[in-house]
């Protein structure tokens, strides 16, 4: 919002300088006041030059993590296209209007009587995402990060596939951006928490949290880069039909939710296998101890008889 109004008042170059200065100051403040969690285990490698410090070659043997990487890749494939194309969709359908760089608003014969600035739709979506980011932390503590992440991603996909495609009035558009904004905040903020959920409570495993999170985002980076480009090409190819990007984004997020469900299933299967293995180990230990006691008692009895 700040950049939008500054460009109109002082020009693009000066507006970028003001916003960049504010960004530097806020990031510097975060660096000074942020403190690491003393309870979190940190790895201390002997040298940072080894590949194993940056890439855990055994990570993808964990099926739950592999499914999560696929889920985040599909998520980024379609998620950002919603934000990149929202204003263009609003202007094309007459729900909103875009400002003319020379002043005033661009002419649009489809403009609805109660149309609003298309920019405000994106601002509302970004603002309501704060609700999802904050509330998801509470929900994860009670229901598990992966479970919450899967549900909010599924809901976000359904909102895109159903509500966005049917929105043809300003009120419907506002309803979509508010609801999608709330769930998008949770969707985009929970991947690191999902990685922590997969690693489990073991301190040795939690020490790999940063490494595995970086690997996950590295896998998804290519999809985050190409997804909006593909969505834009679909709009152009089908003559400004924004149903293409709506279906593209919704389908990608739906597949992402399915991959998250598979990740949850793999995690539960792994935990069940570990639980049965531990039970068998304890049962074997108890059985061995009882056999040893029986043999000891038998030897004592034989000596007494002698």
Pin down the residues of each PLM region.
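Helix-loop-helix hairpin linking two adjacent transmembrane segments in secondary transporters
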Residues: 1-38
